[in-house]
From Swiss-Prot:
Gene: ybeM
Record EC number: 3.5.1.128
Gene Ontology MF terms in the entry: deaminated glutathione amidase activity
Protein family (similarity comment): Belongs to the carbon-nitrogen hydrolase superfamily. NIT1/NIT2 family.
Key words of the record: Hydrolase
Domain CN hydrolase: 1-238
Stated name of the protein: Deaminated glutathione amidase
EC class of the enzyme, as a word: hydrolase
Alphabetical list of InterPro entries matching this protein: C-N_Hydrolase, C-N_Hydrolase_sf, De_GSH_amidase, UPF0012_CS
PROSITE patterns: CN_HYDROLASE, UPF0012
Enzymatic reactions: N-(4-oxoglutaryl)-L-cysteinylglycine + H2O = L-cysteinylglycine + 2-oxoglutarate
Keyword Hydrolase on entry: yes
């Protein structure tokens, strides 16, 4: 099946961001994409107000997702993205949602909040407390992760042991010394750790690197974007997963217990 990742620079106006997302969804659907991943925290972004995305939080029943759900009804594609959803007054969850045929079929509150590199996501965002069930798309099992989750191999491994063949990752990977190197290294490492495909969508713009990637179970990049707005696509197959796992049976060779969420 064909998978895709779309990237753009999120603006401070949620209506504009919704239209960009809907346009990318339409482009992906026109190419018969089955699984489409958008970046993280799509409601609003402002280089001078780090809290704008949380301040702009909307309910899952809100207008932003309403626009995307209407677009989703037009195709057979599964679309993955994250937005901030109100939790308690002044706070939010960083919530991944999966859309199919206009319906929200999965949700996942980000487990690992980005309290690193002088940024403290937990100041305004509440962490989730459970791993999302796997999705099924065109007969392939899909695991859900968000951005900073990439640095924690236990989440990817837990989902691979549950049967995941593809791991999706909406992200807004912040620029900084060696951060692009970390991104490419970690994506390849998670693919190799789990012998899963990785489909990662990274927001571009002044603060984030973009560089969306699709990586095969052997850690090979099969589609990649630069720092500019882009839509990338690649073919993925269960046969490739089986082939790699026959040659590199790391999931069967493990001598450690399966990861457990604290």
């Amino acid at each position: 099946m064909l998978v895709a990742a779309g990237q753009f620079a999120v603006t401070s106006v949620w209506e504009k961001n919704a239209e960009i997302c809907a346009s990318l969804m339409a482009q992906a659907a026109e190419n018969d994409v089955s699984l489409f991943v958008l970046p993280e925290a799509l409601l609003a972004r402002d280089d001078h107000d780090a809290d704008l995305s949380v301040k702009s939080a909307q309910l899952l029943e809100g207008e932003f997702l309403g626009r995307l759900r209407r677009e989703s009804k037009r195709n057979m594609m599964t679309t993955i993205l994250t937005i901030h959803v109100p939790s308690t007054p002044g706070r939010a969850w960083n919530m991944l949602v999966a859309l199919q045929a206009g319906n929200i079929v999965a949700r996942y509150a980000k487990l690992h909040l980005y309290d690193a590199f002088a940024i403290q996501e937990s100041r305004r965002v509440d962490a989730g407390n459970e791993i999302a069930p796997l999705l099924e798309v065109e007969g392939m099992k899909v695991g859900l992760m968000t951005c900073y989750d990439l640095r924690f191999p236990e989440l990817a491994l837990a989902q691979a042991l549950q049967g995941a063949e593809i791991l999706v990752l909406p992200a807004a990977w912040v620029r900084g010394p060696l951060k692009e190197h970390h991104w490419s290294t970690l994506l390849a490492a998670r693919a190799l750790d789990t012998t899963c495909y990785m489909v990662a969508a990274g927001e571009c713009g002044n603060k984030n690197i973009g560089q969306s990637r699709i990586i095969d179970p052997f850690g090979v990049t099969i589609a990649a974007a630069s720092e500019m707005p882009a839509l990338i696509m690649a073919e993925v197959t269960p046969e490739r997963v089986r082939q790699v796992r026959a040659q590199l049976p790391v999931l069967n060779n493990r001598r450690f217990a399966p990861p457990q969420l604290l």
